[in-house]
Structure formats: structure tokens, C-alpha cells
């Protein structure tokens, strides 16, 4: 089991500059001093809240900043041209000595509508994008398909890692079986309930029973963390931070959804952290991605990072 960082980059009652500075400082800290942290992922949505509009650009900066960590980005590929994503991924793979992780996810309805994509073929568009990207990465070439019309071309620079480039798919009800057929690891949605994550994992395993080798697949579990000796303070900070959830779940009771998230993430005291980590086994996760962004006190963040070294030996090793 390894630890990683996960950045939503939502500027809750603070400036974008401060949010990005906190991300940079946290990544620099764990890259230098905490060997049990192996990855850092940057999330992206075209929304009123997210401030990383170009996740691969952010990843390239963090790759240049660090020496050891693997850096990844979750890219909404349906609203971008797959050849451009393949080019950028191949370039980052070469320049980072294969430390780049390619994370892929689909769009919410707002993104599909804004960029004039058809909702009724959304998953088919996603799969078509992925096929082009993966072909370009693994063979250095790609060609058109049902949704894209261009001649067979060479992607430059060529990807050095090819099929060994780490790839992750954001878990969803429409993508999980498709991901399992390709033995692609999942990054679970932080906003899904543990029960939903567990259902997706079981669906993944059910598909994998049909002669698909997933023995080396390492799913990732994102966990919002806010620990404080005063549980009420942790709850207040985390509640304020995730209040944007109304954008993602406008049809739900917002107070109820926020309370649900607080209960299922590591929000509260140290004991809440230990109990939440038990969820990893239920979802087949081998990596846990921690988001400290709701915590106001940097010293408290460092304390939690130090906790991870002490508890790592108690986590599943396979």
C-alpha cells in the first residue's frame, strides 16, 4: 500500500494563488522527505469551482519541480482532441523519465453541453478518444475511427513507456465494465459513497472473471482528510470546503449529501482517520490518495503526513 496526494484545487474562500501555492508546497514537501508517498494527482473539471483548466500543464510543472514522485492528471478527454492528449502525454513521458501518469475521465452534463458534445453517445465518444490515445502511446501511430476523421499519423515525440505508461480511469457506472475488459485500474470518485465504490469494484471483478488478468491492477482510493483535536473544527472546515457539491449533485438534499461525505472521509480526530482507511480493502484499492486542502493549518497537515509513516505497516500490502 502506498500513499499519494490528490488535489481538487477548489478555492474555497481563498485566492487561486494561495490554493496553487499550497499544492506546490505540499508536493515539494512529500517529494523530498516522505518516501512512502509515491504519487500526486491533479483533478480537473470545467466548472465554476475548479481552477486547473489545463491539468497536463499543471502536471508538467510538478514533474519539473520534483525528483521522485509520479505525477498524474485526470483529464476530461471527451472535450479534447485525443491526438493532442497523446502528444502531450508522450512528451511528458520522455521529459520526466516515465514519471507521468495519464488519468482519464468523462464529463458531467454541463461540460458536454458547453463544448457541444452529444450526450446520447457520450460513452462511445469516450471510448473512441481512448482508443486513439492508447494506440498513439503504445504504437507511436494513430488513425481515425467513428468519431474522428484524419489520416494515420505518427505521434511525436514517441512515448518511451508505451504499454508501461501508468493509466487510470475514473470509476463510473458506465465505464467500469469497459475498464475491466481492458484491465485498466480505477480511480474512485471521492464524492461517491463507499457503498457505490464497493458496487463498482464488484462489477469490475465480475467482468474480470472472463479470462482477464487483473492481478497487477492497482486501484486508487481518494480520501478527503481534515484531522483536528477538536472534531467540530474539522467538520466545519470540511463542510465549507465541499459545499460546492451542489454543482455536482443539484438534485440531492445538500445538507444530507455533505453529512454523508463527512462521515465517509477522514474528517474529525485521529480515530476517524484509522477507521476510514478500512474502506480500502472493500474496494480493492492498493493506493490511497489524500487531499488535505480543507485543512487551514499547515502544521496539522504535516502531522497527518507523519502519521502515515506510522500506520503504513498496518495497511494491506497486496
From Swiss-Prot:
Signal sequence segment: none
Lineage, top-rank taxon, reads: Bacteria
Q: Name one GO biological process term.
A: bioluminescence
Question: What are the TM regions of this chain, as residue ranges?
Answer: none
Q: Which PROSITE patterns would you find in this protein's record?
A: BACTERIAL_LUCIFERASE
Which GO MF terms are attached to this record? alkanal monooxygenase (FMN-linked) activity
Q: Which GO terms describe its cellular component?
A: cytosol
Subunit structure of this entry? Heterodimer of an alpha and a beta chain.
State the protein's purpose. Answer: Light-emitting reaction in luminous bacteria. The specific role of the beta subunit is unknown, but it is absolutely required for bioluminescence activity.
* Family that this chain belongs to: Belongs to the bacterial luciferase oxidoreductase family.
* Protein name per its UniProtKB record: Alkanal monooxygenase beta chain
Q: Which organism is it from?
A: Photobacterium phosphoreum
